[in-house]
Amino acid sequence: MKHTRPVDRPLRRLRRAASVTAVAAALLAGLAPAAGAAGPEASAARAPSPGRHLDRAALQAGLDAVRDAGVYGVFSAARDGRERFDGASGTADLTTGRPVRADLRHRVGSVTKTFTAVAVLQQNAKGRVDLDRPVGDYVPDLLPGERGRKVTVRMLLNHTSGIEDYIADAFPSLRQGSTTSLDDHRFRTIRPTELIGYGVARPQRFEPGTDWSYSNTNYILLGEILRKVTGQDPERLIAKDVIRRAGLRDTYFPGTDPHIRGAHARMYESFYGLIDPPRDYSIYNMTWGGTAGALVSTPQDLNTFYRALLTGDLLPQRQLDQMRTAYDVKDETGAVVLRYGLGIFSLDTPCGPAWGHDGGVWGAGTIALSSPDGTRQFALGHNLTKYQRLNEAGTAFDPHPADAAMRDYRDQALCGRTAPQAPAKDSIEGPAALSPVLPALTAR
């Protein structure tokens, strides 16, 4: 099968952009929420459609549209009550031509954060973690001094701590607009305390609790709080109390093993044209993601997880309510583009709000969303990332048809229909410095 490569743009445009290293450090980490304005159609239709169901032909056509837009391979699972759809389109391995399957294992990036947040809230229910207690009370050596007294556990969970992300320091070539660190550190093992040290060494982005800024450092700190209060390795704790409790069979932390166990796709990273042709990063030591983004899972497992979470199987009602108490994330015009709770976010769709998370690591992108009552979910993985290109000014991303195709698929999977699309803008606004925001799926 012939694959359409996303439109190439001069690489000098990316390198000359004043904020390129910030964009690189934020976006390509991919352990990031896909924040974006919900668009007019979302506010016009808040209630679920009566009699909606899974239209398998429309869903498969939606996956084919993502492939036709230039993404090498895309695979997904959708559920509505007892109805299920499993579909895939495209290629898992460009060298062999092996096709993707719906049940492939995949690195799911920041979807890990919901799992970590559930584990923290379980400890809150047991009285071991107070969400409004200072982080310094739990791990004083990791967040010392005044910051340790001001930043609370809740602020870590909802990204209002103001603590800087560690990605740009963990992959230092990004600050020079180069991707060489991605290859240099493919087999590196890095300790959680090192990652935290990178983020904490940077100046605060704002006074704790006064603003919002996505930071993977927050969730590595949460892992260390879990270690402190339980005496257990946090990844093993999450495996026992969250993954096994939810009945997930294909979800695990890989630890230092750079290989994914079981069937999976190759994972191709473009990095906005800096890596041309896109390079396979499916073999990678994911200790740099840890409790912020190292999980391997499948679309089917993610649907099962979010259904179990939102129907109350993993948390008491009080903790679930806390989890869905969200901070309104606004753009420069003051419009709410995302509502971020405790390790889970809400965005608008044509049939009302959906809850979940997304993520991406080198070459692997994921989105998993559910209706608020947990009756309908979808999860999608794709194996080409950062295919977008900056505009001529180097300040924003040009619209890419794959993003629109993924939004259409999202709406079909969750709502049984797609929303009318507003005329495309000349470009998609780029993210603020070191504030990860993926343009796919929700940007309009």
Name the predicted role of every residue range:
Residues 1-42:
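Secretory targeting and sorting signals
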Residues 57, 117-118, 133, 220, ...:
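A generic alpha-helix surface/boundary motif
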Residues 2-3, 36-87, 279-444:
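Catalytic loop of the DD-peptidase/beta-lactamase superfamily, centered on the K-T-G motif
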Residues 85-87, 95-98, 165-167, 388-389:
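Short, solvent-exposed loop/turn elements at domain surfaces
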Residues 63, 82, 113-116, 120, ...:
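Residue-level preference for non-acidic, small/hydrophobic
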Residues 146-354:
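Short, surface-exposed loop or secondary-structure junction motifs
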Residues 81, 92-94, 161-162:
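Solvent-exposed coil/turn segments that connect beta secondary-structure elements
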Residues 69, 95-155, 206-215, 290:
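Short active-site loop at a secondary-structure junction
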